[in-house]
Amino acid sequence: MNDKRVFQNGRRAFAVFRRGDFQYNGVMEKEHFEQAVTARFLRRVNRFIADIELSDGQIVQAHLANTGRMQELLRPGVAALVRPAKNPARKTAWDLIAVDHGGSWVCLAAAWANDFMREWLSKGRIAGFYDWKQIEWEKKIGNSRFDFAVTLQSGERWLLEVKSVNYVIDGHALFPDAPTTRGRRHVEELLALREEGWQVGVFFVTMGQPVVDVGFNVENDPEFARVMQRAIAEGVDVRAFSAEILPPDVYFRGERPIR
C-alpha cells in the first residue's frame, strides 16, 4: 500500500489508529535505527547530498532528508550514523540519519519527528490526548494537509502540526534554523480552522540533544516567530517534547517549556 497514512502492523494495515484496533509492540522505536552503522561526515555537497566515509574507508554519497542549514551539526569529520537506502536502485545507496554532537546522537531526518509523535500519541505519552479514540495522519482538509487529526473519546477534534528541532544553543532549542514560509503557512491555516470548530496545536520535537526549553528563532525567521506568538495569544496548544537517540532505540524524555 502506498498511502503514507497507513501503518503496517504485521499483516494488518490501518489508515488510522482506533482504540482497540492497535496494540503497540515497540517496533517503531527501533525500525529507524536498527540498520544504522557508524561513519564519518565529510562535507555537504548540496541540500540533499552529503559525502561520508564508511568504516572501511570507502567514501560514498548519502541522502540527507533535511533542508535546514545545520551548520553547527554538519562539521567535517564528525561521527555519523547512516543506513542503507530502502530502494537499492536509488542514486545514493545510503541515508545520513544522525550525527554526534556533544556526545549525543542528533537525528537529521526531519520527517521522523512525525513518526516519534505518532508513537507517543498512540502510547498515551502526550498529556491531553490519553483518551484518544482515533488518530489519523497526513489529514487533508480542503487544499491543505496536516500532520495529525486526533479525535478524543469526548468527540473533541484536534489538528496537530509537528516541527522537528535540532538547532540548539547552550541547551536552548530554537526553531527554525532557516526561514520557513511553509511552516508559517501551516500555523496560519491552523488558526483559520480553529474558527471552524477544530482544536489545534503545534508540537515541537527536539531530535536528540538535551535541551532546557524551546523558543522561536526571531533572528532567522521573524515572521514565523510573530505568527507563533499570535497562535499562543489565541489559545493554540503550543508545546515541545524531547527525544533521546540511543540506537537502535528512541526514548521519550518528556515535555520542555516554550519560551
What are the roles of these predicted feature ranges?
Residues 39, 146-177, 190:
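Conserved catalytic cores of phosphodiester-cleaving nucleases, focusing on short active-site segments
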Residues 68-81:
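Short nucleic-acid-contacting surface segments enriched for D/E, G, S/T with interspersed K/R
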Residues 29, 207-259:
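Domain-level recognition of nuclease-like catalytic cores that cleave nucleotide substrates
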Residues 71, 102-136:
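Acidic-basic catalytic patches of nuclease active cores, encompassing PD-(D/E)XK
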Residues 23-24:
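Short, positively charged and aromatic/hydrophobic N-terminal segments
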Residues 171-181, 188-220, 242:
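Nucleic-acid nuclease catalytic cores
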Residues 78-87, 242:
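Flexible glycine-rich surface loops and low-complexity tracts that mediate binding to linear polymers
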